Amino acid sequence: MSKTLYERLGGANGIARIVDDVVEAHMNNPLIKARFVPLLERPDHLAAAKKHLRDFLGMGGGGPEKYSGRSMPDTHRGMNISAQEYMAAIDDILATLDKHKVDEQTRKDVLAIAYSLKGEIVHV
């Protein structure tokens, strides 16, 4: 039996490390950091955002987590995220997966999820 995406990402602990590193990468990315740095002023919001990301990726990857956050359109509505910003975020995700030595098929699976959400994030 093949492993789930959740298992291939290292389960809850692996996903938590990946989420932490992706958020850090976003905060250092000149194209999108203005959207993330304000979270540093609200540690409670930063913690909640990371939890939602962990739960979203965990549930989507076949893990036991339950995502209880808003829908992607509701979360991103009014932010006017450009395609360039979206791709900058994708680049951060891919670089983080490389950092964690995630195999190519798992990278493709994560990328497929990310691309499937593009219409719910960009210019909504």
Predicted regions and their residues:
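Core of compact, soluble alpha-helical bundle domains
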Residues: 1-124
